[in-house]
Amino acid sequence: MLRWLTAGESHGPSLVAILEGLPAHVQVTSDDVADALARRRLGYGRGARMKFERDEVTLVGGIRHGETMGGPVAIEIGNTEWPKWEKVMAADPVDPVELESLARNAPLTRPRPGHADLVGMQKYDFTEARPILERASARETAARVALGRVASNLLEQAVGARIVSHVIELGGVRAPAGLWPQPEDVDRLDDDPVRCLDADTSKLMVEAIDQAHQDGDTLGGVVEVVVHGLPPGLGSHVHWDRRLDARLAGALMGIQAIKGVEVGDGFELAATPGSRAHDEIVSGTDGLRRVSGRSGGTEGGMSTGEVLRVRAAMKPIATVPRALRTVDVATGEAAVAHHQRSDVCAVPAAGIVAEAMVALVLADAVLEKFGGDSVRETRRNAEGYLDTLRFR
């Protein structure tokens, strides 16, 4: 079983991520992790922070000479802006007189609608939002993306599965239906300003972002994660918490700003007659296959062996330049929310984070099904399982 944990704040010295339960000999390097983190910064409409933020990756433990050793993997991602924040975010006490002179330490008492600010202050008994927003920030997803790269490497090396994501909707502009990216499309997608497969749609999405920026607004959208090469039988039908689609949905909903998830054609199936909603099964030269992919590659809480597709809907960024109404909790008076630099749209980056979460869930499911203390053992077990399937 895989377990993962992250720690750290948006403006703290670093983020730390730990992944436990990996077999030995998963090939992974600091360059792999750095590449994944660079992809997280992609996308038209990102804020100024993406221009100067750099992720300093240190593989702290669990990896030797480019291979995991079977113990927990620990990754640290340094914050290059830490010198600006070392007094405000210091772990040890700082002289109150010195803190009062720092503009960055001004109390954040005007909670932002759509953020964790207000309810976090209520729940954890804080008088201002800084202790809440620092951890609630999407900066934390960098740690998950780092772990997701390790999980992705395991999936490819153990069972040959590969993951790719793309943007299918942004600001109300939707790509044509039925476009499913292949693993070889990754570079082309990453070169597109909004990571959309359709060039004409991409141009319209960029125009929508430009208009939102001009209007002082933000935009959301929908990303789709596609997984090729999964074996059938990951997950289980026997308990709710072992169902693969439930685990995927929970992982995606755990990404900041995600408000909805669907597997396959999801909500569209609610309006489709049963005679057309399900993937019929046929027998061909390559064995049993489903003639469509409406289910998204899962049935009964298990992977079917077909292409897996999951979608996540991201709400618009809650830090809106056109400041929203709020209440100053220090005075009880009506006010406008705090505003700081932010993205106009982070939907393309959300796809990279979604890839990471899907990879972590699937890697856990693969190890649950096939076990193994080394990648070779996991791969051998998976191959033996496929060779002995009663129905193929």
Curated annotation (Swiss-Prot):
One of its GO terms (cellular component) is cytosol. Its cofactor is FMNH2. The keyword rRNA-binding does not apply. InterPro entries: Chorismate_synth (IPR000453), Chorismate_synth_AroC_sf (IPR035904), Chorismate_synthase_CS (IPR020541). FMN binds at residues 135-137, 256-257, 300, 315-319, 341. The keyword Flavoprotein applies. It is an enzyme of class 4 (lyase). Homotetramer. This is Chorismate synthase. It comes from Nocardioides sp. (strain ATCC BAA-499 / JS614). The gene is aroC.
